[in-house]
């Protein structure tokens, strides 16, 4: 069957239009991500009243343990583009590490508002990174998030976890002996199964640019630092933990 020049021209135009539309969508996604990630966000840290200052002086400074993957960031490596990451979404940074003598690139996406979150909570808590990832990767991610601020100096990795039935369990006693002062923020309930009364659950994050989960936690974290024992409050959140 002969193809007429008109038909060939129409198909060429349709193919060009499809590519153009894909490019426009890519630019729009990138612009929306930039606007949301870097928009001005405020959480007013008001001066403490004399009563609040007195209360804070009577309790120990708390420790906030932070998970990395799907809590503060999401990443994928060479050749593995997870369906949760929208095609064309640019990473916030790229890490180059060597694993088992093989160079690997990780494309890392930061959860919306993570920089602002770290800036605020570092004024209230001693921050600790605790990830089940390998140290060579987790350390590089933590360095990027810290950005020379010195707020993520203490770090624990896979070798500090306990392996049970194929899952890595985080023992908070290696972070601090007094668990009344320790809070862990982690998207995986299985990771803190030994310490559910110390945990704040957070939804796993992969690519949603409109996510505000970190911002939503600021009022709770602000109030929690005044408690004598964080477990007296967090033990009431057990219904929010999706069991492992």
From Swiss-Prot:
It is found in: Membrane; Cytoplasm, Perinuclear region. Residues 57-224 form the FCP1 homology domain. It comes from the Eukaryota. Its main location: membrane. One of its GO terms (molecular function) is protein serine/threonine phosphatase activity. Its EC number is 3.1.3.16. InterPro entries: Dullard_phosphatase, FCP1_dom, HAD-like_sf, HAD_sf, TIM50. SUPFAM superfamilies: HAD-like. Coiled coil: none annotated. SMART domains: CPDc (SM00577). GO terms for biological process: cell differentiation; nervous system development; nuclear envelope organization; positive regulation of triglyceride biosynthetic process. The keyword Ribonucleoprotein does not apply. The chain crosses the membrane at residues 7-29. Serine/threonine protein phosphatase that may dephosphorylate and activate lipins. Lipins are phosphatidate phosphatases that catalyze the conversion of phosphatidic acid to diacylglycerol and control the metabolism of fatty acids at different levels. May indirectly modulate the lipid composition of nuclear and/or endoplasmic reticulum membranes and be required for proper nuclear membrane morphology and/or dynamics. May also indirectly regulate the production of lipid droplets and triacylglycerol. Induces neuronal differentiation by antagonizing BMP signaling. Interacts with bmpr1a, bmpr1b and bmpr2. This is CTD nuclear envelope phosphatase 1. The lineage of its organism: Eukaryota, Metazoa, Chordata, Craniata, Vertebrata.
